Amino acid sequence: MSQYVVCALYKFVELENYQELREPLLALMEAHGVHGTLLLASEGINGTVAAKREGIDTLLAWLNDEPRLNGIVYKESYSDTQPFNRTKVKLKKEIVTLGVEGIDPRHVVGTYVKPQDWNDLIADPEVFVVDTRNDYEIEIGTFKGAVNPNTDTFREFPDYVKQNMDPEKHKKVAMFCTGGIRCEKSTAYMKEQGFDEVYHLEGGILKYLEEVPEEESMWEGDCYVFDGRVAVNHQLEKADYDLCNACRLPITEEDKRSEQFEQGVSCPKCFGKHSEEQVARFREREKQVSLAAVRGEQHVGGESAKQRQQRRAEKLAKKDVQRKQA
């Protein structure tokens, strides 16, 4: 069985004085080996974290003990290695950034559709199916027949709707995203724009892959995830992708065989797009990563800081011994 539990969670709820949650939440995560990032805002909480079973259970218990966060929505998958290097709790204006004022899924939202009912909905020729994720995510996998809005960030989605969709023409709209949170915002936005029948996949793609057998599935490809696994397959296991450390886009084994690929410096998607200064910086970073690997250490994250401190302490102790022997 995989060693780490990866937990994606969110809840839209009014969090007055949300800033006060940051320190106790961060302290609990650090004390129980929970890595990843949580976002706090006045509209709620969102994030993905990973830890051993005990760490995730402790975090979820803490969140459910907070009255405003009780009943938080979460989905679990698994990883053989820790997919995050750091532990962060960030304060934000929005927990998922649409960039449109006044959109509140707590008051207006689309109709939730269970994974078991999703196939029938998107097979309906009268339903316009939209993937609300970014272009690089959709490139890895999507639902059969879904429209790609060709967005680089979620902030671009409202412009896509304004330029390409019409409430009179698109009377039934079905939307989906990785874990469900982007659709909370996007369906709320579309309802505000006058679209009447707006549906979204409850629990997102991850819940669909978990509950719908692959032989019945309308999902094609793999699912991009925002952690070290890069993507997961239909069994929610790590798929055959890595991340280019220069552009942070997913790459395949074929990409790595390209002449334009240099580990940590470039890939076919970003080759020639970085300045000479950036390339030099990437090469130096890759050199430090390699040196850390030789020492059996991490180059980034909380553990790397501890390892550097330990190395410095050992050097100082050695110098002290040499001084006393002199």
UniProtKB/Swiss-Prot annotation:
It comes from the Bacteria. Catalyzes oxygen-dependent 5-hydroxyuridine (ho5U) modification at position 34 in tRNAs. It catalyses: uridine(34) in tRNA + AH2 + O2 = 5-hydroxyuridine(34) in tRNA + A + H2O. NCBIfam families: PRK00142.1-4. One of its GO terms (biological process) is tRNA modification. Residues 311-326 have a biased composition (Basic and acidic residues). It is an enzyme of class 1 (oxidoreductase). It comes from Vibrio campbellii (strain ATCC BAA-1116). Residues 123-217 form the Rhodanese domain. Residues 293-326 are annotated as: Disordered. Belongs to the TrhO family. Pfam families: Rhodanese, UPF0176_N. InterPro entries: Rhodanese-like_dom, Rhodanese-like_dom_sf, TrhO, TRHO_N. Its EC number is 1.14.-.-. Keywords: Oxidoreductase, tRNA processing. The gene is trhO. One of its GO terms (molecular function) is oxidoreductase activity, acting on paired donors, with incorporation or reduction of molecular oxygen. This is tRNA uridine(34) hydroxylase. The active site is at C177 (cysteine persulfide intermediate).
